[in-house]
Amino acid sequence: MTATVKDELSRLRVAKPCCRRAEMAALLRFGGGLHIVGGRIVVEAELDTGATARRLRREVAEVFGFPSTVAVLAAGGLRRSVRYIVRVERDGEQLARSTGLLDQRGRPVRGLPPQVVTGSACDAAAAWRGAFLAHGSLTEPGRSCSLEVTSPGPEAALALVGAARRLGVQAKSRDVRGVDRVVIRDGDAIGALLTRIGAHDSLLAWEERRMRREVRATANRLANFDDANLRRSARAAVAAGARVQAAMRILGDDAPEHLLAAGRLRIEHAQASLEELGALADPPLTKDAVAGRIRRLLALADKRANALGIPNTEASVSPDLLENA
């Protein structure tokens, strides 16, 4: 889903100047950094999509009036995908000051610029949009779904957490193997953030996949529940059949005929339900009547077995018998 969201955000048109500035400030902060080349400050951003690189170059030119260059690094070695390096060299220091990467005294800002941190909700949304375009990812919906942004440092991560809070979204900053990440795991919170940053089509696709996954999970739970019920029913039928056979051996013909008839039905139709056995009886019986007759047959046989000192009907139900049911 990451590529889908970034493609949509790269095509999003933003009208308010403050939002465009906030987005570029976050994109440059999370996607790149400042370098000294030949005694001059160079602003550089490394991005993973051509669409994001084009958006950055266009906004830098339209909002700040500075030209930029782009270099394409092919995949290979440690790089698993193509990377796009956008540089502003000649006007790097001016851009860094304009976007808040440098403070008024020319020192690097470790978090996000004050105008973004203390700005309005639209500035917070723009900052998240820029941060996601720079180093964000969105996993498929599921039990472990997450929206993450890799941060250049803890200060920037905490600033992004604060921006999410201003949008009514709970995000957490985590240090994962020495890398600072801002993470949102709640599905509803992810949906709310996608809405606020303008990824509406991506949200619809994500929610559709989320719904399909939930439906499949529910269907699987119901299927497992049904399977468990069937196994329990099968084992109960096998156990009942074994006990009835033992009862018939213990009693022989020395039992009321209506009880013996119910026992024979149970043996002849081992997998049938009590309701089905009742329908097979002549005359037909209710399932409660069938259950009662079989219960009395077993009780009569167990009483006879105890009097004779022989194993009762329950002794015929072995673990191996149930395991093979």
Swiss-Prot record:
Sequence similarity: Belongs to the WhiA family.
InterPro entries in alphabetical order: Homing_endonucl (IPR027434), Sporu_reg_WhiA_N_dom (IPR018478), Sporulation_regulator_WhiA (IPR003802), Sporulation_regulator_WhiA_C (IPR023054), WhiA_LAGLIDADG_dom (IPR039518)
Gene Ontology MF terms: DNA binding
Organism this protein belongs to: Frankia casuarinae (strain DSM 45818 / CECT 9043 / HFP020203 / CcI3)
Taxonomic lineage of the native organism: Bacteria, Bacillati, Actinomycetota, Actinomycetes, Frankiales
The protein's name: Probable cell division protein WhiA
PANTHER family: CELL DIVISION PROTEIN WHIA-RELATED (PTHR37307:SF1)
GO BP annotations, alphabetical order: cell division; regulation of sporulation
Residue ranges of the annotated DNA-binding region, renumbered to this chain: 273-306
A Pfam family this chain is assigned to: WhiA_N
